[in-house]
């Protein structure tokens, strides 16, 4: 373990996460998204085959946010399913937009 002392570790090996009460209606969504990140899932728009399903207007992406749309190489992701437009692992069509118009 990389943590040097027992007193620095979380009690019972559990890390508490508190979701703000204003987000309570989104608790299930947040938990599923966190689980997907923990399992190593990538966002749908990063899939190696995403250009078969999406058009991303890179010129309309906020400066510094382009990395959110980096396409993976085929060797970086194994695609067991078709592209899922309804996935919780896909950003909305105006996420990181410079002017609020769809990406």
Swiss-Prot record:
Residues annotated as domain Peptidase M12A: 1-103
Keyword list, A-Z: Hydrolase, Metal-binding, Metalloprotease, Protease, Zinc
EC number: 3.4.24.-
Pfam families: Astacin
Biological function: Active against casein. Has a role as a digestive enzyme.
Record has Protease as a keyword: yes
GO biological process, one term: proteolysis
Species assigned in the record: Argiope aurantia
Protein's name according to its UniProt entry: Astacin-like peptidase p16
PANTHER family: DISCOIDIN, CUB, EGF, LAMININ , AND ZINC METALLOPROTEASE DOMAIN CONTAINING (PTHR10127), METALLOENDOPEPTIDASE (PTHR10127:SF780)
Cofactor: Zn(2+)
The keyword Thylakoid appears for this protein: no
A GO molecular-function annotation: metal ion binding
InterPro entries (UniProt xref): MetalloPept_cat_dom_sf, Peptidase_M12A
């Amino acid at each position: 373990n990389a943590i040097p002392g027992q007193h620095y570790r979380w009690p019972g090996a559990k890390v508490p996460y508190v979701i703000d009460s204003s987000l309570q209606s989104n608790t299930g969504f947040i938990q599923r998204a966190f689980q997907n990140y923990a399992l190593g899932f990538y966002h749908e728009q990063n899939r190696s085959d995403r250009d078969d399903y999406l058009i991303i207007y890179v010129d309309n992406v906020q400066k510094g946010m382009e990395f959110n749309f980096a396409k993976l190489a085929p060797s970086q992701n194994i695609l067991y399913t078709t592209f899922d437009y309804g996935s919780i692992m896909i950003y909305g069509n105006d996420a990181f937009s410079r002017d609020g118009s769809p990406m």
